[in-house]
Amino acid sequence: MSSASFTTKALSVLAALTAASAPLVAASPAHALANARNVTGSSTTSDSIVRLHIGNTACTGTMITPTWAITARHCIPEDGIAGAAIGSSTLSQFQQVSQAILHPTADLALVELPNQASSNTVDLYGAHVQPGENGQAAGWGGYSAFGQNVAQQADVQIQRRVVNVPSPDRTAVLLEGTVSNGRLVPGDSGGPLYINGQLAGVLSMSTDVENDALDGTVGWYIPVAEHAEWIAYYTGKHIAPIAGAPAELVDATANPTFIPAPQPFTGSSIGGWALGSS
């Protein structure tokens, strides 16, 4: 990893998210996909995923222009050695991070790289996400947790658009999705929610409860459609008008999150390469 001094720009810099507990459900920063499957092949989704290391923080991001990646704000410390590698394999080379721009209120950050990516970049999903839509989560958490050399992906079904989730930031507006064929466990923070191969959300939190088998079976995503103007302003990315309207907002404390049945980790790895059970 290259050593780099980078600058952080924001209207306000808030503390990184920390684990929170509450009856029935708690949400904490999401970190690795376990019991999932490899992100493979040459495609927009595999080519645009980013492995981020800034200070002692390991996260995931997504290339949305040749020089800009989007991730979660809580992934960005105030200083430290900063590097990013583009692509779904650890064979990808790290490059330094030039700067990070933090969203003033949402758990979003933009990370600028000095060299243009030669691989694909991903477009934003062209509509506001609605309950019942299906997508894929992807992330690099398995690299730190299990030594997996390939980014992992699982399936997500959006359940609700929520606020007041038991977490450090109860004002956050989030897409709540149940995870199947894998689960979020610690490095996937900031990773993408893809719908039809386009970026619909950025992972902010996942379930963190007393039963470890339930951890990571629900993820909360920042809906990028609701922040398209901010993204376009700083990156220069052309974003077409977003279709539809945001889904009804549900109070997640008054209407607690349903946590799916446990999904214990049953995958394995050979030589560091992940082998999912599905």
UniProtKB/Swiss-Prot annotation:
Residues 1-32 form the signal peptide. It comes from the Bacteria. GO terms for cellular component: extracellular region. The keyword Lipoprotein does not apply. It holds the Pfam family Trypsin. Coiled coil: none annotated. It is found in: Secreted. Its main location: secreted. One of its GO terms (biological process) is proteolysis. Keywords: Disulfide bond, Hydrolase, Protease, Secreted, Serine protease, Signal. Disulfide bonds join 59-75. One of its GO terms (molecular function) is serine-type endopeptidase activity. SUPFAM superfamilies: Trypsin-like serine proteases. SMART domains: Tryp_SPc. Residues 33-236 form the Peptidase S1 domain. The active site is at 74 (charge relay system), 123 (charge relay system), 189 (charge relay system). PANTHER family: FI18310P1-RELATED (PTHR24276:SF98), POLYSERASE-RELATED (PTHR24276). Belongs to the peptidase S1 family. This is Uncharacterized peptidase cgR_1176.
